Curated annotation (Swiss-Prot):
It comes from Caenorhabditis elegans. Disruption phenotype: Defective touch receptor neuron synaptic transmission with reduced levels of rab-3 at synapses, conferring touch insensitivity. Irregular touch receptor neuron shape. The heterozygous mutant, but not the null mutant, rescues the touch sensitivity defect in the mec-15 single mutant. This is Tubulin beta-1 chain. The lineage of its organism: Eukaryota, Metazoa, Ecdysozoa, Nematoda, Chromadorea. It is found in: Cytoplasm, Cytoskeleton. It comes from the Eukaryota.
Length: 441
């Protein structure tokens, strides 16, 4: 079976990660103690993608929980599903990274990383045919960004041919936690560009907008935001966990979605969007789902897809629906909005269908877009980075941990290169002028 090892690092990663486990445990009929209490064979058919069968009828997540301070771990452990995880898989330090990327990547994190890798290795060895890894983390803090990227590169060394996926929460200007977020994020992106196969960019600002505008929540909490993220994560991983008419796995996803190795930053979306309190009971149709899916308001990254073009996109539909109708609607969208899709990748929209809808919904759709508009997000971070870096503000926190200014300059130019690559492909046309641009690749 194609197993996935899940890693969650830092405060944000652990909060999103534990929410994700709540959602998928619920979908698979696993109760908080790991007992199977479900009612359908389909729940167990591919349960071993994410769970180890520990004893008769007891399932344990293939999850590794990492943090440089015990606080968040304690709240996960005392949370609703805290007893689900293997106690040995909680790996934490005592010192904290203090929102400092250098601490997570070079000093504090580097001391803890071997302990984490031991646990990862143990999880990987208990698999039959490991498909890859997924990491949940944020890019604005110290642990998730610094130590998260360190873990990625270490795992990459040891398992070079396995897929590496990340769900990365990108800092946003409106919802800021720390002043050094642009530094941490830029240093992280510098790593992600080289070391991951796909990165789902989740953006607090976009999540807040969805909560305000669509879900009509007046004061969204992080709980509400994480609920949205977990819905998306559950959608992206559906095909791996349930049988369906058209299945995908992490590698197929990467093959279909990544036209050039560096351009693997995706915008996720979800439909229908409903608030936690009223997950609606009105019937939704396939055309509505498809429409909503591609709607800018439903994107979990604060970029407007109408400002760029889709290089590739994928939609994962869940629920009992007619394949024919799904295909028709997807074609319909592409024909109507053809200017938003690059013309030099024919049929660049992939569809997958899984028969089992999420809890409380008749059908849902998860959208994954590789759009050149994601450059807005990197531009935004880059501008903030440059503003501070020009004055060398806050740099001493990083150089004090042994970092060199050179590394900042490199990260900055790598991110700017990424932005111009997106721009280049946005403007490229299918005719021969574009062909020359590719020869230079």
């Amino acid at each position: 079976m194609r197993e996935i090892v899940h890693i969650q690092a830092g405060q944000c990663g652990n909060q999103i990660g534990s929410k994700f486990w709540e959602v998928i445990s619920d979908e698979h009929g696993i109760d908080p103690s790991g007992q199977y209490v479900g009612d359908s064979d389909l729940q167990l058919e591919r349960i071993n993608v994410y769970y180890n069968e520990a004893g008769s009828n007891k399932y344990v997540p293939r999850a590794v929980l990492v943090d440089l301070e015990p606080g968040t771990m304690d709240s996960v452990r005392s949370g609703p599903f805290g007893q689900l995880f293997r106690p040995d898989n909680y790996v934490f330090g005592q010192s904290g990274a203090g929102n400092n990327w250098a601490k997570g990547h070079y000093t504090e994190g580097a001391e803890l990383v071997d302990n984490v890798l031991d646990v990862v290795r143990k999880e990987a060895e208990s698999t039959d045919c490991l498909q890859g890894f997924q990491l949940t983390h944020s890019l604005g803090g110290g642990t998730g960004s610094g130590m998260g990227t360190l873990l990625i590169s270490k795992i990459r060394e040891e398992y070079p041919d396995r897929i590496m996926n990340t769900f990365s929460v990108v800092p946003s200007p409106k919802v800021s936690d720390t002043v050094v977020e642009p530094y941490n994020a830029t240093l992280s992106v510098h790593q992600l560009v080289e070391n991951t196969d796909s990165t789902f960019c989740i953006d607090n600002e976009a999540l807040y907008d969805i909560c305000f505008r669509t879900l009509k929540l007046t004061t969204p909490t992080y709980g509400d935001l994480n609920h949205l993220v977990s819905a998306t994560m559950s959608g992206v991983t559906t095909c791996l966990r349930f049988p369906g008419q058209l299945n995908a796995d992490l590698r197929k996803l990467a093959v279909n979605m990544v036209p050039f190795p560096r351009l693997h930053f995706f915008m996720p979306g979800f439909a229908p969007l409903t608030s936690r309190s009223n997950q609606q009971y009105r019937a939704i149709t396939v055309p509505e789902l498809t429409q909503q899916c591609f709607d800018a308001k439903n994107m979990m990254a604060a970029c407007d897809p109408r400002h760029g073009r889709y290089l590739t996109a994928a939609a994962i539909f869940r629920g009992r629906m007619s394949m024919k109708e799904v295909d028709e609607q997807m074609l319909n969208i592409q024909n109507k909005n053809s200017s938003y899709f690059v013309d030099w990748i024919p049929n660049n929209v992939k569809t997958a269908v899984c028969d089992i809808p999420p809890r409380g919904l008749k059908m849902s759709a998860t959208f994954i877009g590789n759009s050149t508009a994601i450059q807005e997000l990197f531009k935004r971070i880059s501008e903030q980075f440059t503003a501070m870096f020009r004055r060398k503000a806050f740099l001493h926190w990083y150089t004090g941990e042994g970092m060199d200014e050179m590394e900042f300059t490199e990260a900055e130019s790598n991110m700017n290169d990424l932005v111009s690559e997106y721009q280049q492909y946005q403007e490229a046309a299918a005719d021969e002028d574009a062909a020359e641009a590719f020869d230079g690749e």
